[in-house]
Amino acid sequence: MEKNKMVSQGNQEPTATPDTMVQPFAAIPFPPPPQNGLSTDYGSQHTQEYATQSTEHGIPLYGGGQSHAEHSTPATSTANASSTTDGSQTEGQQSQTQNSENSESKPTPKRLHVSNIPFRFRDPDLRQMFGQFGKILDVEIIFNERGSKGFGFVTFETSADADRAREKLHSTVVEGRKIEVNNATARVMTNKKSVTPYGNGWKLSPVVGAVYGPELYAAAPGLQADVSLATEAGVPLPGPRGVNTYIPLIIPGFPYPTAAAAATTAAAFRGAHLRGRGRTVYGAVRAVPPTAIPTYPGVLYQDGFYGTELYGGYAAYRYTQPATAATAATAAAAAAAAYSDGYGRVYTADPYHALAPATSYGVGAVASLYRGGYSRFAPY
């Protein structure tokens, strides 16, 4: 019995269950990085008491199973983030593709030019004639002060409808008129080159140029000594021998005043009493008799209207009466035989002056013609 007691008292501790036993293959945790200046040996003594992990490096403090789970979590999140990014990129590409398709599929308006349409046509008539081929954005018929000019423009929403209307309606007969339908094009303004009548490219005559630069045209005699020697001048021109020649800033053949007159002219142009009118230079130009200038046509007026005969007397200019008229009757007869119209043209006996108007074209006949077959409001 004592033996039984001894056996029963041999081990009084409860039998350890498998759950409470330590796992034989537990992974050795890595020591955390030093924090707050503490060594790694101190931090590794209490590994099992703290269930936290380092926020800086993400190294777990537990065994291998938990570490694998925690490592797999950021990988999964990274995969999700990458898939989300790919999805957003795909959506962006799809939206861009849709935008490009919308821009490509957007209809392009097209404008047609319709000519030789009936003159009574108005915008609703033209819209009704072309509206069967598609949506019309604008219709315009060109008018002037006398009515329709017989042509207009039709703008379709799409170019396909415009092309179909042009193919169907071109060269069709509407109210006896064969209409023409073509694509409207922008009017091209031709650049007409102005032909300069001067040999060296000058466009201002010396008289007009003297108003802008009196010192230039009122040059001193020393500058006019020899035109051909002034090679350090201003404008190169192709010479007769194929080389560039130079002309000076003065114009050959122009009647320049003297040096004193040039100074007087420049001072007069700067004065306030003339108010910008170049009377001095113009008077100097008029004082010189006109000479033939082949290079500058039209510089000096050689017409008699600007000569001294204009100021020779009103009666001598307007009327050409005989000087030997003794009586008033003789003077009247001479004036009737030769008279003027005020512009220097002298008329004598004209055989056409004796013609009488034809009887068939009287006032009544002309009025009936006007009221019958002719209307001044016809467009053409």
Curated annotation (Swiss-Prot):
Stored InterPro entries: Fox-1_C_dom, FOX1_RRM, Nucleotide-bd_a/b_plait_sf, RBD_domain_sf, RBFOX1-3, RBFOX1-like, RRM_dom
Pfam families: Fox-1_C, RRM_1
Chain ranges of the RRM domain: 110-186
Gene Ontology MF term list: RNA binding
Primary location: nucleus
Cellular compartment(s): Nucleus; Cytoplasm
Bias-annotated ranges (Low complexity): 72-102
UniProt feature, compositional bias: Polar residues: 1-20, 36-56
Region (Disordered): 1-117
Function recorded in the entry: RNA-binding protein that regulates alternative splicing events by binding to 5'-UGCAUGU-3' elements. Regulates alternative splicing of tissue-specific exons.
Protein name: RNA binding protein fox-1 homolog 2
Source organism: Xenopus tropicalis
Gene encoding the protein: rbfox2
